Amino acid sequence: MAAQMYYDDDADLNIIQGRTVAVIGYGSQGHAHALSLRDSGVDVRVGLPESSKSRAKAEEDGLRVVTPAEAAQEADLIMILVPDHIHRDLYANEIAPHLNEGDALFFGHGFSIRYGLITPPEGVDVAMVAPKGPGHLVRRQFEAGRGVPVLVAVEKDASGSAWDLALSYAKAIGGTRAGALKTTFKEETETDLFGEQAVLCGGVSELIKAGFATLVEAGYQPEVAYFECLHEMKLIVDLMYEGGISKMYWSVSDNAEYGGYTRGPRVITESTREEMRKILQEVQDGTYAKELVEEFDKGRPNFLKRREAEQGEQIEKVGTELRSLMSWLKN
């Protein structure tokens, strides 16, 4: 089935301009959404705890800042843009008591809805607008008159017009300038988690560390191993980002291209693919979500232990020393 894409002509900005919006959170995505909504003529306020260090920044940016509860009470569209592990308690304590029939609850990621951490009441629209880029890029592109592609989904259309509202919101942050891709909360959440775990954050990191360790154990200098297995990764990824894997292979030497074709499949074997399928299954059946929630409910002991161990890896120490020589990284 062909992807369903929507653009500026498919969205009516007047719809979101007629709503009262609360953006909960002012991190990477929160600041981009709030500022772009404001610049699109939307009545927006930012919901942050009194103790939040981001309050001063949001106020400096000219936004009205209130507590999350006050924001939820004032608004009829609430966009939650705080870390996933905060959603459950934030929703129960600050947002749910102020939801009314006809309100809309929006998300930048589908985790809490997909795994039942939040169960919105009847009569409330539930939708997602998720830019496929970091907040600073979303904001920069908006200011330049362009946009970053967004994923848009509607989980519950209580009003009968939730889809139009979601597209209007996407237009207000520049998403429909580039294109809004229709998806579902299930698809966005499961593919996002799998991509992070098996490829982007987990898979690539472990591949780099394994390559580095293989060279060092064979007697090569750690500094040279770092250059070959980590530092040059950016060069390769940038080529893929610009033109896909084919452009990367077109750009590297024939030697590198042949080596990639013939040796790459020996690294990513059928056994590796089977583990990928297991990881996906754990995402799909809720095993991972249950593990994550339990870990954070306990105060993140294993998470913090692994973070500390990661920071002590030899590759991190070598990288710190080598990056100090790279003047272009200091700007």
UniProtKB/Swiss-Prot annotation:
Which key words tag this protein in UniProt? Answer: Amino-acid biosynthesis, Branched-chain amino acid biosynthesis, Magnesium, Metal-binding, NADP, Oxidoreductase
Instruction: Give the gene that encodes this protein.
Output: ilvC
List the GO biological process terms: isoleucine biosynthetic process; L-valine biosynthetic process
Give the record's family classification: Belongs to the ketol-acid reductoisomerase family.
Provide the KARI C-terminal knotted domain boundaries: 184-329
Residues noted as binding NADP(+) in the record, renumbered to the chain: 26-29, 52, 54, 135
**In the Enzyme Commission scheme, what number(s) does this protein have?**
1.1.1.86
Q: Key word Magnesium present in the record?
A: yes
**Source species:** Thermobifida fusca (strain YX)
Give the protein's recorded name.
Ketol-acid reductoisomerase (NADP(+))
Under PANTHER family, the record lists: KETOL-ACID REDUCTOISOMERASE, MITOCHONDRIAL
What does the record give as the reaction this protein catalyses?
(2R)-2,3-dihydroxy-3-methylbutanoate + NADP(+) = (2S)-2-acetolactate + NADPH + H(+); (2R,3R)-2,3-dihydroxy-3-methylpentanoate + NADP(+) = (S)-2-ethyl-2-hydroxy-3-oxobutanoate + NADPH + H(+)
Enumerate the residues binding Mg(2+) 2.
Answer: 192, 228, 232
Details of cofactor binding: Binds 2 magnesium ions per subunit.
- Boundaries of each KARI N-terminal Rossmann domain copy? 3-183
